[in-house]
Amino acid sequence: MKHLWFFLLLVAAPRWVLSQVQLQESGPGLVKPSGTLSLTCAVSGGSISSSNWWSWVRQPPGKGLEWIGEIYHSGSTNYNPSLKSRVTISVDKSKNQFSLKLSSVTAADTAVYYCAR
């Protein structure tokens, strides 16, 4: 029975659990009001060209996740309409990474920022 449960859990696991690809965000911990937040997500264990879309999300204190936007490895982007005027997401295939820039930040942008695929 233990083997059956393990099998069921493995099959039901999200794609990212089964993958060896790892994502690591980097950037400043603090940004001054009206400044620009710049974050980079390094992809390891696989090529950034192997997945269709790479995303940024954030979680404000005490709130749920908010989707910021996504980029295709070719450079095509989709953005959250509420943030679109302030967001730029770019990809650097030579460095196997993608980046987020959020301009004109305010206290309302306080959040934990995550990259995802």
UniProtKB/Swiss-Prot annotation:
GO terms for biological process: immunoglobulin mediated immune response. Its main location: secreted. Residues 71-77 are annotated as: Complementarity-determining-2. Residues 78-115 are annotated as: Framework-3. It holds the Pfam family V-set. Residues 54-70 are annotated as: Framework-2. Residues 116-117 are annotated as: Complementarity-determining-3. Residues 20-44 are annotated as: Framework-1. It is found in: Secreted; Cell membrane. Residues 20-117 form the Ig-like domain. Immunoglobulins are composed of two identical heavy chains and two identical light chains; disulfide-linked. This is Immunoglobulin heavy variable 4-4. It comes from Homo sapiens (Human). The lineage of its organism: Eukaryota, Metazoa, Chordata, Craniata, Vertebrata.
